[in-house]
């Protein structure tokens, strides 16, 4: 120590206040040195965001009554008849976005042609075809429509009819929805479907189908609410694992279904009429829908259960009518939509860029903004990890996926699960500040650091992130780390 430094130390030590100041300076020096060393052992990565359209499970534009790569519908027409056999691929690549969900629906008379004899091969085939085309299946079972009859055996079962042949709608046999035989036979179909398909990992969602044409929940012959409730309860009982979607039409029923865990769907998205004289086809987008969402209290249902929209007409039909596509798409985002059924009709060329932008916003969109971890780590200890994620979409992901960090070298690898529930990642920022255990059997050496969200059933990467670095196996490379058994951890 130099003479000057010695005199300075003695000066501090000869005074009580100086001793305190001296010790403080020594402590700060130690902490500064320790902090500097710790900072040297930290890696901070900031992946570069990408702006691609991503195909991810449970979100996006769906195919309708068909699967990826198959022939599209004409611009202004579609069929309500679901597929009952394999469909051939299109002769040329369809002008349609790739999608993770196929939405199909079938009539009761097809699924149960004789009482108690269910033709589930139809739905089994659709699930198989969806898997073969890289999709999951969303379904609705429909009692009848204005063109498709109830099963003949049901009409002869003693069930009550609500209308007569001489009525304006007499060509279609309208059931009495308060009749116990309707509840009995329809609930048997629903119960059988639930026993066979509830929890199937390749089933995306199931519509709650109850009253009226297509099971949409409206009819000139509406029963009192207790009967509607009973027809909703059979679905809640049959499907306790697969997400259910409540149809929008009847307010009290909509509120009841969503209060019991269902998401919701509507089937006239894009109807921009400002008035209507038809009580069963009111002006939807500019009258019914926005106000009914508030009046039924379902504004926040999207936070835990999905929202799905189906076009009124088709997208080319919107264009033909001169509808404001910007307003329609914006409204869908405001409702926090995850999936949209545009009836497998091609999007008009002039609107493609608008739909591409829309697809980048619907559902969830995960972006890793920042990740911090140790540069050198010793096996068998807890390692601090900090992550900042952004969900740039308008909805959460509704199924559980495991967020995993993988340490991989040419000789071995280890997967470390991050203890977060990604279903809680609402739009906006989410942060993980915690520590994870580094497996004790890791050998010394350099390891790549990779991340993924894994399907907990298969252990395979399931979610595409909006960042660079995706590798062929679906993992994202974010950095590197050194494992060193002798490394002291500060």
What is each of the regions a protein language model found here?
Residues 126-137, 161-205, 227-234, 238:
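An active-site-proximal structural segment forming one wall of the substrate-binding cleft
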Residues 107-120, 170-185, 212-224:
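The substrate-binding groove and active-site-proximal loops of carbohydrate-active enzymes
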Residues 19-30:
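Bacterial N-terminal signal peptides
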Residues 40-84, 98-100, 131-135, 205-346:
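Catalytic-core regions of glycoside hydrolase
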Residues 335-363:
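A eukaryote-biased signal for short, well-structured alpha-helical docking elements
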């Amino acid at each position: 120590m130099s003479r000057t430094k010695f005199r300075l130390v003695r000066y501090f030590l000869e005074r009580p206040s100086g001793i305190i100041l001296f010790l403080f300076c020594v402590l700060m020096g130690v902490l500064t040195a320790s902090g500097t060393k710790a900072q040297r052992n930290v890696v901070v990565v900031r992946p570069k965001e990408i702006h691609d359209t991503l195909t991810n499970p449970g979100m996006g534009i769906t195919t309708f009554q068909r699967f990826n790569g198959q022939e599209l519908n004409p611009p202004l027409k579609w069929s309500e008849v679901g597929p009952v056999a394999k469909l051939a691929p299109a002769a040329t690549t369809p002008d349609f976005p790739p999608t993770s969900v196929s939405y199909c629906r079938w009539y009761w008379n097809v699924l149960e042609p004789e009482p108690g004899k269910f033709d589930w091969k139809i739905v089994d085939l659709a699930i198989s075809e969806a898997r073969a085309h890289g999709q999951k299946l969303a379904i609705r079972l429909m009692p009848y429509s204005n063109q498709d009859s109830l099963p003949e055996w049901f009409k002869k079962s003693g069930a009550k009819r609500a209308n007569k042949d001489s009525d304006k709608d007499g060509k279609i046999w309208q059931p009495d929805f308060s009749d116990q035989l309707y509840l009995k036979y329809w609930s048997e179909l629903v119960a059988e479907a639930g026993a066979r398909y509830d929890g199937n990992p390749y089933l995306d969602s199931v519509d709650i189908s109850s009253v009226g044409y297509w099971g949409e929940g409206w009819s000139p012959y509406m029963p009192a609410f207790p009967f509607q409730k009973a027809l909703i309860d059979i679905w809640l009982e049959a499907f306790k694992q697969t997400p259910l979607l409540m149809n929008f039409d009847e307010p009290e029923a909509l509120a009841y279904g969503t209060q019991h865990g269902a998401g919701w769907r509507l089937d006239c998205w894009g109807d921009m009429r400002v008035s209507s004289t038809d009580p069963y086809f009111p002006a939807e987008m500019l009258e019914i829908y926005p106000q009914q969402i508030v009046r039924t209290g379902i504004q926040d249902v999207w936070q835990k259960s999905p929202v799905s929209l189906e076009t009124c007409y088709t997208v080319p039909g919107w264009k033909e009518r001169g509808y404001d596509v910007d307003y329609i798409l914006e409204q869908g985002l405001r409702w926090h939509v995850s999936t949209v059924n545009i009836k497998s009709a091609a999007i008009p060329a002039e609107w493609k860029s608008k739909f591409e932008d829309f697809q980048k916003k619907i559902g969830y969109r995960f972006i890793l903004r920042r990740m911090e971890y140790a540069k050198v780590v010793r096996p068998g200890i807890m390692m601090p990890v900090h992550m900042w994620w952004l969900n740039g979409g308008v909805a959460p992901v509704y199924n559980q996926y495991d967020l995993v960090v993988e340490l991989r070298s040419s000789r071995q690898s280890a997967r470390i699960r991050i203890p977060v529930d990604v279903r809680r990642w609402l739009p906006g920022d989410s942060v993980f500040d915690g520590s994870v255990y580094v497996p004790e059997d890791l050998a010394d050496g350099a390891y790549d650091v990779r991340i993924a969200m894994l399907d907990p059933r298969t252990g395979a990467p399931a979610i595409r992130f909006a960042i660079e670095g995706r590798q062929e196996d679906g993992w994202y490379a974010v950095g590197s780390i050194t494992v060193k058994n002798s490394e002291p951890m500060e």
